[in-house]
A protein has these predicted regions:
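N-terminal cofactor/phosphate-binding cores enriched in small/glycine residues
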Residues: 5
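Active-site region of glycoside hydrolase catalytic domains
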Residues: 11-13, 23-226
Length: 226
C-alpha cells in the first residue's frame, strides 16, 4: 500500500500535518492488524503535492528533499511500531524508462531534468533510510524498481552490448545507487551520452553511501528483445 503525501501535507509547505489524513491511514492499519496482515508501505507513489510541482518544479528542485524528509519523518514517528516495512519510492527508475519516449526538440533538456530530479530522489531516499533507522531500529526500508527483463535479439556482440547498456540505464542505474551507495562507473557513460551535467557534491556522495536500503523489491511486467 502507499501513503499519499498530499493527504498528510496538502501543499507540502505546512508546518503541521493534516490530522485527518493521518487518521485515515490509522483506520487502515487497525483493520490490517485485525486480520494479522503486515503492511508494506510505500512513502512516495507519484503523489508530490501540486503546489510543490507548480511553485518549486517538483523534484527538479533540491528544496523538495527537505519537504519530503519532513513528510517521511511524520510517517516514521506516527506509525512507529505499527509499520515495520517501508519502500522509499515506487518504481524510482520509471523516469529513465520513459525518458525521450516521445522525441521532442528539447530532448537534451528533458534528460538534464530527468537525471537531476532522479539525483534528488536518490538523495532523499538515502536520507530517509537513515532517518527511519534512527527513529526505529526495527524498520526495514527498501527500494522498489520497475523491472523488465530483456535479452539480446541475437548472439551478435553488438546486440549483447546493446542489451547490457539498456539494462544498466533502465534497470540498474537507480538500484545500484540505492543498494551499493554510489553511482556505478557506467553512469559516466550514460551522462556523457545524454549531455548531462550533475551537481554531485562530496556531501551528496557521503549521504548516498550512508543511506543504503535494507532490501530490494521490484515489479515485473514484460520481457523484451534488444
Amino acid at each position: 500500500m502507499s501513503i499519499d503525501w498530499s493527504r498528510i501535507y496538502p501543499t507540502g509547505m505546512e508546518e503541521e500535518p493534516n490530522r485527518q489524513g493521518l487518521e485515515f491511514y490509522w483506520n487502515i492499519f487497525r483493520e490490517l492488524k485485525k486480520y494479522n496482515i503486515e503492511p508494506l508501505v510505500t512513502i512516495w507513489h507519484g503523489e508530490t503535492p501540486l503546489y510543490i510541482e507548480n511553485e518549486l518544479l517538483g523534484w527538479a528542485n533540491r528544496k523538495t528533499i527537505e519537504l519530503f524528509k519532513k513528510y517521511a519523518r511524520t510517517l516514521f514517528e506516527e506509525y512507529k511500531g505499527v509499520v515495520h516495512y517501508w519502500l522509499t519510492f515506487n518504481e524510482i527508475n520509471n523516469a529513465l524508462m520513459f525518458l525521450n519516449l516521445l522525441p521532442t526538440e528539447s530532448a537534451a533538456n528533458d534528460a538534464q531534468r530527468t537525471f537531476t530530479l532522479l539525483h534528488h530522489r536518490l538523495l532523499a531516499s538515502a536520507e530517509i533510510v537513515q532517518m527511519g533507522h534512527a527513529i526505529d531500529p526495527e524498520n526495514k526500508i527498501g527500494c522498489m524498481i520497475c523491472y523488465g527483463e530483456s535479452y539480446p535479439a541475437t548472439c551478435n556482440p553488438k546486440d549483447v552490448i546493446a542489451d547490457m547498456e539498456l539494462k544498466q540505464m533502465q534497470q540498474f542505474y537507480c538500484s545500484d545507487v540505492q543498494v551499493r551507495g554510489a553511482y556505478p562507473s557506467y553512469s559516466n557513460r550514460i551522462w556523457e551520452k545524454y549531455g548531462v551535467q550533475l551537481d554531485v557534491t562530496a556531501e551528496d556522495r557521503a549521504v548516498l553511501k550512508a543511506g543504503t536500503v535494507d532490501f530490494y523489491s521490484f515489479s515485473y511486467y514484460c520481457t523484451s528483445l534488444v
